[in-house]
């Protein structure tokens, strides 16, 4: 066999081998690229799902925060309204007519004053209270003035027992007892 033919045959086999390797490499590269593309798509899909979940969680959290803030604002407004109602009630009690005031003071003294007690009232009610002490023939002394919207404080001589029967205290007690009813009437 001549050398040219052998060289030609080797060259031909080499070219076929190169072609075969190139085809296998191209197939392998295509396979790797397809797998990489599929993996990238899967990673992208998972990242997108995670981002959507995170966005949804943030949205829910923001909605929850807004709802909480709205509820807080509503409660603040309701509290302000209840305080205004309480202040109006105090004002109404402070401004009650003298006849009604006298009846209430008389009732408080009759039912609660014990012999030897000291009675305190607001300056504006001093004359009425002194008059009632005489009228009811109570064995008590008038002790002076206190800062309140009305009513009396009764104290034993030693100062150990003190009955706060001021309108301030009575209004507060009634208001606290009726607060849920007032709230229902105003806000339901």
UniProtKB/Swiss-Prot annotation:
One of its GO terms (biological process) is proton motive force-driven plasma membrane ATP synthesis. GO terms for molecular function: ATP binding; proton-transporting ATP synthase activity, rotational mechanism; proton-transporting ATPase activity, rotational mechanism. The keyword Membrane applies. GO terms for cellular component: plasma membrane; proton-transporting two-sector ATPase complex, catalytic domain. It is found in: Cell membrane. The gene is atpE. Signal peptide: none annotated. Keywords: ATP synthesis, Cell membrane, Hydrogen ion transport, Ion transport, Membrane, Transport. The keyword Hydrolase does not apply. It comes from the Archaea. Has multiple subunits with at least A(3), B(3), C, D, E, F, H, I and proteolipid K(x). Component of the A-type ATP synthase that produces ATP from ADP in the presence of a proton gradient across the membrane. It comes from Archaeoglobus fulgidus (strain ATCC 49558 / DSM 4304 / JCM 9628 / NBRC 100126 / VC-16). Belongs to the V-ATPase E subunit family. It is a peripheral membrane protein. Its main location: membrane. This is A-type ATP synthase subunit E.
């Amino acid at each position: 066999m001549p050398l040219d033919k052998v060289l030609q045959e080797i060259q031909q086999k080499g070219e076929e081998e190169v072609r075969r390797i190139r085809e296998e490499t191209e197939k392998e590269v295509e396979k790797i690229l397809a797998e990489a593309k599929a993996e990238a798509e899967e990673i992208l899909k998972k990242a997108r799902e995670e981002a959507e979940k995170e966005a949804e969680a943030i949205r829910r959290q923001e909605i929850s925060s807004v709802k909480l803030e709205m509820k807080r604002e509503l409660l603040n407004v309701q509290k302000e309204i209840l305080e205004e109602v309480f202040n109006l009630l105090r004002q109404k009690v402070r401004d009650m007519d003298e006849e009604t005031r006298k009846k209430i003071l008389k009732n408080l003294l009759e039912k609660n004053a014990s012999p030897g007690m000291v009675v305190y009232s607001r300056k504006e009610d001093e004359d009425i209270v002194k008059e009632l002490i005489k009228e009811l023939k109570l064995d008590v002394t008038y002790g002076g003035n206190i800062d309140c919207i009305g009513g009396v404080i009764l104290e034993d001589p030693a100062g150990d027992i003190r009955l706060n029967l001021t309108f301030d205290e009575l209004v507060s007690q009634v208001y606290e007892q009726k607060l849920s009813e007032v709230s229902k009437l105003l806000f339901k």
